[in-house]
A protein has these predicted regions:
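Solvent-exposed loop and beta-edge segments used for protein-protein assembly and interaction
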Residues: 2-4, 62, 123-129
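Beta-strand elements of well-folded, non-transmembrane domains
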Residues: 12-16, 72, 133-141
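Intrinsically disordered, low-complexity acidic/polar segments
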Residues: 19, 77, 140-144
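Acidic, Ser/Thr- and Gly-enriched intrinsically disordered low-complexity segments
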Residues: 31, 42-61, 78-92
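Short, well-structured alpha-helical interface segments that form or flank functional binding sites
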Residues: 34-41, 60-63, 128
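Short, charge-patterned binding micro-sites
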Residues: 62-80
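Internal, well-folded beta-alpha domain core
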Residues: 83-251
Length: 251
């Protein structure tokens, strides 16, 4: 199967970010650097497309993040945020509500039930973040002809240069917007900061990027052993053995 020979680089920045470590999800505590999943989400927000059908979404491709470069040192800030204890319904449930198959159930900010309603939680977030992200397009079967790949690359480049996005990119939480600029190959770029850290097991993604159809499915958690050297975090391909994944059907 052909893959895109072209890589795309974005410089992204924002005031706040929180890439929550899964072992600390009640009181949020951020990784010191953006996760591959969050980086992929920024590329997706600019351009990601596929064929929609009743069974889900058949994407033309997925983004493979290859490198994350820190352009500012990680700095933490303690925040207290109002959150709700309930879980936002998935697409399948929303469709049942819209079709009248189920009665809509709102998320109440205040409730007599101790398991629902609002709560204040501590968040250890990052402030004044700036990264350079490098990724390439990995086409799905049936969409890997060279002319198709060139079309996807051109559409992303055009949209990114014009600052267009389907939804506002964000850094881990939707309250923390991310701003972006497309970087031309070879242009003068800021050097990564002098930061070295063995992060350990880091969240790679919450979806199975190998799947040809995206559904409102259970999370598919993958991890990798992350080490930042000289302000650079190299990301292995999703198919690499370095990325620890559950067996299909065991999520």
């Amino acid at each position: 199967m052909n893959v895109s020979k072209k890589t795309h680089a974005l410089e992204v920045w924002g005031d706040l970010a929180c890439f929550t470590r899964p072992e600390m999800k009640v009181e949020r505590f951020s990784y010191p650097v953006i996760t591959p999943s969050a980086a992929r989400g920024i590329f997706d927000a600019i351009y990601w497309e596929g064929i929609r059908d009743p069974h889900g979404m058949k994407p033309y491709f997925h983004w493979q993040v290859e490198r994350i470069e820190l352009l500012e040192m990680p700095r933490y800030i303690a925040l207290r945020r109002n959150e709700v204890k309930g879980i936002v319904p998935g697409t399948a449930k929303l469709n049942r509500w819209m079709n009248g198959a189920e009665i809509p159930e709102p998320l109440w900010a205040d409730s007599d039930d101790a398991t629902t309603g609002r709560t204040q939680r501590q968040t250890m977030a990052l402030k004044n973040v700036r990264y350079r992200l490098t990724a390439r397009i990995i086409p799905k079967p049936g969409f890997s002809a060279p002319e198709q790949i060139n079309k996807f690359d051109s559409m992303f480049e055009r949209r990114a240069k014009q600052g267009k996005c389907f939804q506002q990119p964000f850094f881990g939480c939707s309250e923390f917007p991310a701003f972006f600029e497309y970087l031309q190959p070879g242009e003068h770029q800021k050097q990564p900061v002098a930061f070295d850290q063995h992060i350990g097991w880091m969240l790679y993604d919450v979806f199975d990027l190998r799947r040809d159809v995206v559904r409102d499915d259970k999370p598919f958690i993958s991890l990798f052993d992350a080490t930042v050297v000289g302000g650079v975090l190299e990301i292995p391909p999703f198919s690499d053995e370095k990325v620890r994944k559950p067996e299909r059907g065991q999520v």
